[in-house]
């Protein structure tokens, strides 16, 4: 019985004396080289083992990492809460850089809790950490970095340093690469010198001091360490840890090597390496292509440079010729007198960024309008490109455009100048930021104008048209008054624009026009019959515009049910006959508006759109009616159908002046001629 108890007690004592960790351990190991396949060495990433026994952590792959681990865990603590035991390691390293003075980041020796660094990044992170875990205490990593790039974000001192790092790429302490000799003199070393260097890393569990020492390969270990720091590693190390090397590349081609390695825990120093067995630095030289560039490129360059010069000259000449053709303009002697009003096509091309569709403001039967910014003055402009297939009357047309450009009125869009190129004419206007009036009237507009704004636009256009007819030095017949040619400035003031069809004549005379031009729905019947444009034909178009603004409808609309054209003038006239003319008002106005002003505008619109030009008021009279300086004749629908005297004579119409709204618009014609 006593013997059995003694046996059990003895077996229990043996169990207690065994390590708690059942994993295999290695208290020391030595690799004088790494012959394939190396025992207990795991390589990851782009790391390889060369045929001559060198651990090659990286190749010439950019932005990559390479790792090498000792596969067995090393027990650094007797228990999880115990202190870290003393350990010592020595290894031989070397770095090759494709450019002798610049490297693609460095390498490191590390002790980590796991045999893989899955989240580690390349470049400045050295394959140790990432942008998300750098500096975290949960990393539990001790590293000795051999860095060849200065990264200010990690407080690096230079681009050739050794540092002791704990859980971070910011070194606890670092030093310029070198060693102290026997006479205590510091000697510099260069990591990318393509030479082997031996490193010793020692930790003393009594003093908690970490020493890193370096020397050229073949030299004895210096007595004085290169970098020393006192740090208790108990909170950094777990009970079992893994050893290894890491390296990373950037955009500069570089390779990192480990030639030999020994390690010991719970001992004074690591086993010494047998230096004669440590592999030599690999012969890394230029490739055949690099040798070609070095030896043959000078001769090749002598032959290539003249060829490149000739080819470049040909392309340059072609570029200049094409550029000149691209910006070529037509210029005749008679245009000399208009020189200051003529703008360069090149400036307009760059102002509109090549007349791209994204800067297209609108298009119509007479051209397309683009927004632009003049390169030098930064002035915003609108450029209208008008087809000019016929050269007949071109000189007179340009002369009129230049004359119109001299006009100045707050309700006219300033015409800044013109440009003539090939078969087109370009007219340049001030840019109006709020666009044309039509987009605020039709098709459920996103932004609607209240009556006060609309009435202000009407007054503005009437003022501008009165200036054209009576106040300027010559009479200007606009010939294309419509909602899309009324532009709104930043304060929503109405400005009459687009003088591409305008004609000039002296006061007291009529312009000699023989062609009908204008836009459907705005042409007066007398203009269609005779081809003559007068101030009265402008008044007719203005009358249609008045009805558009008040009703929010187009001059001509198609009925969905009957597929027939419905004339706005006929529709408003029908409401007037029924005695409820205000029912023609735009529903978007709501119920808050000046009914007297709206009724005046509607009746004045019908009066201006009368089929007899003699009955239509002048723009002077129109302004007086709108401003309240004169009273609109007391009109009724019967006055437009019955007998009476002419407007201005007892405010009646003659029997011969019948209101024929259908004929006034139904035969409107669009023509590109003059």
From Swiss-Prot:
Q: One MF term from GO for this chain?
A: carbohydrate binding
SUPFAM superfamilies per the UniProt record, alphabetical: Concanavalin A-like lectins/glucanases, Protein kinase-like (PK-like)
Q: Which residues lie on this side of the membrane: Cytoplasmic?
A: 318-674
Q: Spell out the coiled coil positions from the record.
A: none
- Which residue stretches belong to region Legume-lectin like? 26-263
In terms of PANTHER family, this protein maps to:
PTHR27007
Q: Which family does it belong to?
A: In the C-terminal section; belongs to the protein kinase superfamily. Ser/Thr protein kinase family. In the N-terminal section; belongs to the leguminous lectin family.
Protein name, UniProt field: L-type lectin-domain containing receptor kinase IV.3
Q: Which organism is it from?
A: Arabidopsis thaliana (Mouse-ear cress)
Its organism's taxonomic lineage begins at: Eukaryota, Viridiplantae, Streptophyta, Embryophyta, Tracheophyta
């Amino acid at each position: 019985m006593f013997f059995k108890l003694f046996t059990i007690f003895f077996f229990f004592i043996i169990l207690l004396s065994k390590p708690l960790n059942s994993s295999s351990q290695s208290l020391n190991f030595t690799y004088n080289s790494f012959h394939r396949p190396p025992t207990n060495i795991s390589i990851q990433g782009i790391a390889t083992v060369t045929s001559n026994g060198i651990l090659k952590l990286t190749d010439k792959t950019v932005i990559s990492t390479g790792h090498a681990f000792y596969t067995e865990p090393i027990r650094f603590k007797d228990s999880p809460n115990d202190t870290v035991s003393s350990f010592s390691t020595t290894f031989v390293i070397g770095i090759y850089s494709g450019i002798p003075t610049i490297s693609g980041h460095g390498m490191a020796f590390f002790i980590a809790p796991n045999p893989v660094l899955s989240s580690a990044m390349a470049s400045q992170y050295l394959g140790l950490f990432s942008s998300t875990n750098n500096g975290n205490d949960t990393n539990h990593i001790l590293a000795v970095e051999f860095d060849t790039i200065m990264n200010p974000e990690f407080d690096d001192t230079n681009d050739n340093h050794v540092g002791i790092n704990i859980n971070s790429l910011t070194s606890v302490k670092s030093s310029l690469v070198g060693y102290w000799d026997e006479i205590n003199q510091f000697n510099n070393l260069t990591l990318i010198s393509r030479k082997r260097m031996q490193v010793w890393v020692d930790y003393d569990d009594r003093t908690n001091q970490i020493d890193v020492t370096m020397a050229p390969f073949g030299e004895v270990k210096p007595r004085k360490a290169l970098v020393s720091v006192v740090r208790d590693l108990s909170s950094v190390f777990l009970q079992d840890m893994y050893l290894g090397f890491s390296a990373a590349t950037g955009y500069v081609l570089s390779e990192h090597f480990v030639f030999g390695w020994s390690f010991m825990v719970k001992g004074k120093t690591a086993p010494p390496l047998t230096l004669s067995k440590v592999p030599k630095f690999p012969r890394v030289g230029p490739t055949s292509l690099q040798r070609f560039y070095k030896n043959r490129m000078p001769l090749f360059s002598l032959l290539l440079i003249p060829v490149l010069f000739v080819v470049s000259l040909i392309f340059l000449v072609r570029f200049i010729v094409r550029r000149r053709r691209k910006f070529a303009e037509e210029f005749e002697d008679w245009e000399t007198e208009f020189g200051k009003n003529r703008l360069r096509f090149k400036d307009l091309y760059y102002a509109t960024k090549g007349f791209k569709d994204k800067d297209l403001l609108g298009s119509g039967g007479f051209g397309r309008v683009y927004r632009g910014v003049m390169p030098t003055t930064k002035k915003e402009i609108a450029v209208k490109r008008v087809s000019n297939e016929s050269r007949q009357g071109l000189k007179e047309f340009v002369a009129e455009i230049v004359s119109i450009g001299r006009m100045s009125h707050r309700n006219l869009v300033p015409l800044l100048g013109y440009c003539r190129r090939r078969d087109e004419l370009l007219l340049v206007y001030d840019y109006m930021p709020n666009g044309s009036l039509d987009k605020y009237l039709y098709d459920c507009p996103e932004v609607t104008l209240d009556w006060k704004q609309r009435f202000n636009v009407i007054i503005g256009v009437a003022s501008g048209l009165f200036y054209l007819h009576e106040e300027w030095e010559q009479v200007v017949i606009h010939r294309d008054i419509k909602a899309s040619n009324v532009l709104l400035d930043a304060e929503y003031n109405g400005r009459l624009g687009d003088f591409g069809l305008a004609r000039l004549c002296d006061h007291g005379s009529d312009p000699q026009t023989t062609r009908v031009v204008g836009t459907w729905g705005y042409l007066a019947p007398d203009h269609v019959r005779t081809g003559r444009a007068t101030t009265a034909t402008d008044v007719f178009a203005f009358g249609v515009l008045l009805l558009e603004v008040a009703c929010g409808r187009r001059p001509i609309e198609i009925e969905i049910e009957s597929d027939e054209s419905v004339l706005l003038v006929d529709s408003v006239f029908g409401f007037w006959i029924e005695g409820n003319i205000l029912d023609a008002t735009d529903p978007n106005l709501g119920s808050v508006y000046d009914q007297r002003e709206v009724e005046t505008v509607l009746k004045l619109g019908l009066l201006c759109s009368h089929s007899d030009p003699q009955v239509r008021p002048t723009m002077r009279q129109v302004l007086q009616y709108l401003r309240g300086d004169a009273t609109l004749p007391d009109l009724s629908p019967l006055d437009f159908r019955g007998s009476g005297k002419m407007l201005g004579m007892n405010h009646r119409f003659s029997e011969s002046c019948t209101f024929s709204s259908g004929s006034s618009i139904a035969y409107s014609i669009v023509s590109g001629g003059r």
